[in-house]
A protein has these predicted regions:
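Short beta-strand/loop motif that positions the catalytic acidic residue
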Residues: 209, 215-217
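Alpha/beta-hydrolase
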Residues: 149-204, 214
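Conserved alpha/beta-hydrolase "acid-adjacent" motif
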Residues: 222-228
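Flexible "cap/lid" loop of the alpha/beta hydrolase fold
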Residues: 129-155
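Conserved HGGG/HGGXW glycine-rich cap/lid loop of the alpha/beta-hydrolase fold
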Residues: 12-66
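Gly/Ala-rich beta-loop-alpha elbow adjacent to hydrolase catalytic centers
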Residues: 107-111, 115
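Catalytic active-site module of serine/aspartate enzymes centered on a nucleophile-bearing elbow/loop
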Residues: 238-277
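Conserved acidic catalytic loop of the alpha/beta-hydrolase fold
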Residues: 76-103
Length: 277
């Protein structure tokens, strides 16, 4: 379940979770995969000392966000994030708090599509994007045997159940919690994602992306690979494909410090002494 419920300016209720340092001046939005809800922190030891405020909003049908919140397109989810960012900026300005500048965005799997759509549709709100294992729109494959019905298991994320990286302290529990939260409304979230993924019109806007984009792919993954990254690279002038030699779907975890170095290079304006406590 999300840590909080918020109401967007449109009146739509959305589940909201956060991690990292709330004092940081750097906001990073994390767009989760299919299935995924709540908050997944790839490496809390890195996040907590980096100087970043990590935020995730649940898509309709996942966790605490009801079905029927806004439309069903990738663009609608991007616009939800834009509304959240704009409202957060306005609230900080009116309260005299530090006003966030443009945000960094991380997208995992299908969440990468939402991240790129946000950067295309609202370039003034986003300056850096990192997407991980995001398929090209025409290359996405939805596996009903793994992703349609809960309970969801690791293979739904492309992670073998016996992957040795799952033995990292707390990692399996954090992933299982994300999957359990994704199933709180049954298959409503994955059904909404399937509707969104059936429409590829969002990809026609990719040329409008101005943010500095990294497209990250693990060499030991077969169904989504650097060829998907090349598809995006041809459409996004500011993008670069980054290959990771190993780690599979969990390269997101092993490369988390490098990902944060891209989306939050200045450590949220916090000194090393402050970040290390």
């Amino acid at each position: 379940m999300a840590h909080h419920m918020i109401t967007l300016p449109s009146g739509a209720p959305v589940g909201f979770s956060a991690a990292g340092d709330p004092l940081s001046q750097r906001l990073v939005i994390f767009c989760l995969p299919t299935p995924g809800a709540g908050m997944f922190d790839p490496d809390p030891l890195v996040t907590n000392t980096w100087g970043v405020h990590l935020v995730s909003l649940e898509r309709p049908g996942y966790g605490s966000t009801p079905v029927g919140t806004g439309g069903h397109l990738i663009q609608d989810r991007a616009d939800d994030l834009a509304a959240f960012l704009a409202a957060s900026r306005d609230a900080a300005r009116s309260s005299g708090a530090t006003v966030f500048g443009p945000a960094g965005i991380v997208g995992w799997g299908t969440g990468g599509m939402v991240a790129l759509s946000l950067a295309a549709r609202h370039p003034e709100l986003v300056d850096r994007v990192a997407v991980f294992q995001t398929a090209a729109p025409q290359g996405f494959t939805f596996d009903p045997s793994l992703q349609a019905l809960p309970p969801f298991a690791m293979p739904a994320l492309g992670i073998p159940a016996d992957d040795p990286l799952l033995e990292r302290p707390g990692l399996r529990n954090r992933l299982e919690r994300m999957l359990e939260t994704a199933a709180e409304q049954g298959d409503a979230g994955t059904s909404q994602d399937r509707l969104a993924l059936a429409d590829r019109s969002w990809a026609r806007e990719l040329g409008a992306v101005q943010a500095d984009v990294r497209l990250i792919y693990a060499d030991d993954m077969s169904y989504v690979d650097r060829n998907d990254g090349a598809w995006y690279r041809r459409r996004i002038p500011s993008a670069r494909v980054v290959r990771v030699s190993s780690g599979g779907a969990l390269a997101l975890v092993t490369e988390w410090d490098r990902i944060l170095a891209h989306v939050a290079p200045d450590h949220g304006g916090l000194s090393e002494a402050t970040r290390e406590g």
